[in-house]
Amino acid sequence: ASQVGFMWRTMYQIIGKANEIIAAAEDLEDTPSLRATVSEAKCFRAQSYFLLYRTFDRIWLNIQPTPAENVNDPRDFHAASEKEVFDLIYEDLEYAITNLDWVSDEAGRFTQAAARHMKAKAALWLKDWDTTLEQVEEIEKSGHFDLIALNEVFNARDLNHKEALMVQQWS
């Protein structure tokens, strides 16, 4: 039970931080750098909601930040429908796909490829085969990724190889 609670709390903490970043960006000058930051926050939020939905099914959606000023305000949380959850996931990932570069010089950052991969995974969950295929084909056509020899895939010396769309940089 403690691992389940840990996952639930952690995912909603990530979602909360993402909501804060997304909301704060609304008051700033629109720049490519800001759009990239918001895109990464939306990727974290989409990934967290996808993991929560796959694990628990009945989850609540929160897209508003919870600063100290409104922490005690009443909110109407209810179990979101599958459509509501995946509409938000798709919306967040579409924003990221539009605003992120295909690759990053900083290993472990969300990129357009990672956002497309997450959208393909979400589409698989929904049996949305056309969207799945579209996302995977776009990754393949990008020219940034390719298969490598099997004995190199899990070589600890270089996990950030051309087959990896995104590698978390911690263990």
Predicted feature residues:
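An aromatic- and glycine-enriched ligand-binding surface/loop that stacks and positions planar moieties
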Residues: 1, 86, 90-97, 109-171
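Conserved, well-structured interaction surfaces
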Residues: 1-56, 80-84, 93-107
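Flexible, active-site-adjacent loop/turn segments at secondary-structure boundaries
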Residues: 6, 54, 59-60, 75, ...
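Glycine-rich, histidine-containing beta strand-loop boundary motifs that form or position
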Residues: 45, 50-52, 63-65, 151, ...
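Short, well-structured active-site flanking segments
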Residues: 53-65, 129-136
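Short coil/linker segments at helix-helix boundaries
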Residues: 58-83
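Short, glycine/acidic-rich hinge or "gate" loops at secondary-structure transitions
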Residues: 62, 106-110
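A broadly tuned preference for mixed-charge, low-complexity surface segments
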Residues: 66-67, 71, 102-103, 168-171
